[in-house]
C-alpha cells in the first residue's frame, strides 16, 4: 500500500530518485529487438510489417486488408451509444477552441531596401499512433489529431493495432469525427518503422506522435532524425499539493485515477496537514475496493506512490518544481496565489473541482504532456508541434552595399574566404 513520509522530521529524497528514474529506457534486450524490427521493416517493407503484426497481434493482414474501409467506419457508428457521441462532440469543440488560440502567424518586417521575417508552413504529413488491441483510447485520437488539423496538416495517417474484432469502434468514430480518413490496423515498433520509412501499403510521414508501450517509445526514439517525433513519453504521474481545506475523498480519487494506468504510474500527495494525509491514506484503501483495476493500482501505489507531510507550502512548491510532474493539482484554499511560483509541470489543475481526468478528456488543454521530469524543458503537445518556420530575407543592392564590409570582415575572421568572396564579387572587379 502507499507509504507515508514525514518530511517535517526527516527528508528522504530516495523516493524522488526512484520515481524519476523509473522510466529510463535501458532494457538492452528490448532495444535490440526494436532495432531488428526497424531494420527488417526498412528492408522488407510490407512483408516484414505483416509478419510482425501476425506474430505480436495475431492478426493476418495483407495490402488489401491493412487499411480500414468505409464500411468499417459505418459499422463503428452502429456500435457506439448516443451519449458517447454527444460527449465526443463536446470534447472536440473544447479541444479545437483551445488549440485555435495557439495559432501563430507569418510575419514580415520592412526597412529601407530590406525585408525579413518568418513564414509558417504546416507539416505535409503526420502519423498518429493510437494504442489499441484490448485498449480503447478515443481521447488520444482527439488530443493528437485536433492540433494537427488546426495547424493545417494536409495528410494525417493514423495507426492502431487491431484486436480480433478490429480497431475499437470508439477510436474509429473519434478519428472520423475529426476528419482522419487514412487509418491502418498496425501497431508496435513495426508500425512506427513503417511510418518513418514507408512501405508498399503505408505512407512515409514527416512526424510521428502519440503514446505507446516501451516498444513504441524505443522505436520513436531510435527513428528520431529520420522523422520528427513529439516526445518519448514515460509512465503517467500526478503530484497533488493539498492543505487542510482539501477533501480527503477528492484527493484520494485523483491519486487513484493515475495509479490505474499501469504498475509504473506514480501518484504523490504533498500536504501541510498530517490529519489530511492520514485520512487520504484510509480513503485510498476504501475506494480501491470497488475499482476494477485494483491489482494494478495496488502495485503502482506500493512502488511509486507516496504521501508526504511537509511544514509549509513553500516546501511543497520546491518539491513540485524539482519533480516537474506531468500533472500537478493544487488543491489548496487559494491556488492562484502560488501559480506564479510553479515553474515546472506539464499541466496544472487549480482547485478541488478541476480533477486531472477533466483535462484528459474534455476541457480543451492537451493531455499529451512531458513526463519523468522532462517538464523542466519540454512543453505539452500543441499546434506549434505541427508547424515549421522558414526565415525569409531580402536585401536590395543598396542595402547590401551599406553592410558589405562588415559581412566580409566577419567572414574573414572565421577564415571562410569563399563566404567573403560571395559578397565581394557583387561590388569589386577581379
From Swiss-Prot:
Active-site residues, Swiss-Prot/TrEMBL: 326-327
Entry keyword annotation includes tRNA processing: no
Keyword Amino-acid biosynthesis found: yes
Cofactor note: Binds 1 zinc ion per subunit.
Gene Ontology biological process terms in this record: L-histidine biosynthetic process
Binding-site residues for Zn(2+), renumbered to this chain: 258, 261, 360, 419
One GO cellular component term noted in the UniProt record for this chain: cytosol
CDD domains: Histidinol_dh
MF annotations from Gene Ontology: histidinol dehydrogenase activity; NAD binding; zinc ion binding
Cofactor entry: Zn(2+)
Binding site for NAD(+): 129, 190, 213
NCBIfam families reported in the protein's UniProt record: hisD
Function of the molecule: Catalyzes the sequential NAD-dependent oxidations of L-histidinol to L-histidinaldehyde and then to L-histidine.
PANTHER family associated with the record: HISTIDINE BIOSYNTHESIS TRIFUNCTIONAL PROTEIN (PTHR21256:SF2), HISTIDINOL DEHYDROGENASE HDH (PTHR21256)
Name listed for the protein in its UniProt record: Histidinol dehydrogenase
Species in which this protein is naturally found: Caldanaerobacter subterraneus subsp. tengcongensis (strain DSM 15242 / JCM 11007 / NBRC 100824 / MB4)
Amino acid at each position: 500500500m502507499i507509504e507515508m513520509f514525514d518530511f517535517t522530521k526527516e527528508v528522504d529524497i530516495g523516493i524522488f530518485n526512484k520515481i524519476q528514474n523509473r522510466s529510463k529506457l535501458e532494457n538492452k534486450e528490448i532495444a535490440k529487438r526494436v532495432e531488428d524490427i526497424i531494420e527488417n521493416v526498412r528492408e522488407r517493407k510490407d512483408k516484414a510489417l505483416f509478419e510482425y503484426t501476425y506474430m505480436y497481434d495475431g492478426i493476418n493482414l495483407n495490402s488489401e486488408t491493412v487499411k480500414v474501409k468505409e464500411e468499417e467506419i459505418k459499422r463503428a457508428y452502429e456500435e457506439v451509444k448516443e451519449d458517447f457521441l454527444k460527449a465526443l462532440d463536446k470534447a472536440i469543440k473544447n479541444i479545437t477552441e483551445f488549440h485555435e488560440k495557439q495559432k501563430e502567424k507569418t510575419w514580415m518586417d520592412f526597412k529601407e531596401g530590406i525585408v525579413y521575417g518568418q513564414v509558417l508552413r504546416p507539416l505535409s504529413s503526420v502519423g498518429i499512433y493510437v494504442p489499441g488491441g484490448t485498449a480503447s483510447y478515443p481521447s488520444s485520437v482527439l488530443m493528437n489529431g485536433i492540433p494537427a488539423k488546426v495547424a493545417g496538416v494536409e495528410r494525417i495517417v493514423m495507426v492502431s493495432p487491431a484486436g480480433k474484432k478490429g480497431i475499437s469502434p470508439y477510436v474509429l468514430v473519434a478519428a472520423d469525427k475529426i476528419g482522419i480518413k487514412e487509418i491502418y490496423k498496425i501497431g508496435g515498433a513495426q508500425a512506427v518503422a513503417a511510418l518513418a520509412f514507408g512501405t508498399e501499403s503505408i505512407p512515409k510521414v514527416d512526424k510521428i506522435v502519440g503514446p505507446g508501450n516501451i516498444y513504441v517509445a524505443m522505436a520513436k526514439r531510435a527513428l528520431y532524425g529520420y522523422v520528427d517525433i513529439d516526445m518519448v513519453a514515460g509512465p503517467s504521474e500526478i503530484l497533488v499539493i493539498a492543505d487542510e481545506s482539501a477533501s480527503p475523498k477528492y484527493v484520494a480519487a485523483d491519486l487513484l485515477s493515475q495509479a490505474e494506468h499501469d504498475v509504473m504510474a506514480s501518484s504523490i500527495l504533498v500536504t501541510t496537514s498530517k490529519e489530511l494525509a492520514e485520512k487520504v491514506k484510509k480513503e485510498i484503501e476504501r475506494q480501491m475496493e470497488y475499482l476494477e483495476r485494483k491489482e494494478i493500482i495496488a502495485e503502482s501505489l506500493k512502488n511509486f506512490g507516496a504521501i508526504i507531510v511537509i511544514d509549509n507550502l513553500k516546501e511543497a512548491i520546491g518539491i513540485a518544481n524539482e519533480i516537474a510532474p506531468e500533472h500537478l493539482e493544487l488543491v489548496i484554499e487559494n491556488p492562484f496565489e502560488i501559480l506564479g511560483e510553479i515553474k515546472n509541470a506539464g499541466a496544472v489543475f487549480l482547485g478541488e473541482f478541476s480533477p486531472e481526468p477533466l483535462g484528459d478528456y474534455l476541457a480543451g488543454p492537451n493531455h499529451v504532456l512531458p513526463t519523468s521530469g522532462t517538464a523542466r524543458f519540454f512543453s505539452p503537445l500543441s499546434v506549434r508541434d505541427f508547424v515549421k518556420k522558414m526565415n525569409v530575407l531580402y536585401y536590395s543592392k543598396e542595402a547590401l552595399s551599406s553592410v558589405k564590409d562588415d559581412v566580409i570582415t566577419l567572414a574573414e575572421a572565421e577564415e571562410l574566404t569563399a563566404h567573403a568572396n560571395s559578397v565581394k564579387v557583387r561590388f569589386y572587379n577581379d
